[in-house]
Amino acid sequence: PRTHSKTIFFNCGKWEVRKGHDILIDAFKSVLKHDTDVELWMMCSNPFNSPEEENKWQNLYSHPNVKIIPRAETQQEVYNIMAQVDCGVFPSRAEGWNLELLEMMAAGKHVVTTDYSAHTEFCTKENAGLVSISDTEPAFDGKWFFGQGNWAKIGAHEEMDLYMKMMKYILNKKGTVNQAGIETAKKFSWQN
């Protein structure tokens, strides 16, 4: 069990607009205005990015309260990192599954995520802080997606909801186990 009082939020996955990495830092900075004893750990990389693109993401997240963690080599290393954090934050516009989020649940960690896309197959108001999504927009990031479909529109209202869910975690759930998340994760295996 963790013994320090600092709240550590966590995100992992490929650096992408689709995963909400363009807005997560702003929501985190809003949290910092109300509680300076917080950190955001980012275990993100994207092997398909150019060095310039990778630097752009690293620079966006260059902040004394943000820790950029290199990609873990094994599942045990991923778990060891997840065991040190308090809450996963996944403000995704679209997902194929969002395995990292489910792994956080399996570790008993609380999660905050968008109420949109594939992870709604296992995220509920009982096991996740769900950010309301009221609209979609053409999926466009200028690299991978060029408007072929739609994804969640994350505007000022959704960013505020993300920040509020992060603060709600600190005020109401810090130090508790996401038992509903553990029960959800038990329903999934590599066999099904």
What are these regions (language model features)?
Residues 79, 101-109, 117-121:
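Short alpha-helical segment that forms part of, or immediately flanks, the ligand-binding pocket
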Residues 93:
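Aromatic "clamp/platform" in nucleotide-sugar-dependent glycosyltransferases that forms part
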Residues 79-85:
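Short alpha-helical donor nucleotide-sugar binding micro-motif in glycosyltransferases
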Residues 155-161, 174-192:
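A charged, aromatic-enriched C-terminal amphipathic alpha-helix characteristic of glycosyltransferases
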Residues 51-76:
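Nucleotide-activated donor-binding/catalytic signature segment of Leloir-type glycosyltransferases, i.e.
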Residues 2-19, 25-28, 40-41:
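Conserved donor-binding/catalytic core segment of Leloir-type glycosyltransferases
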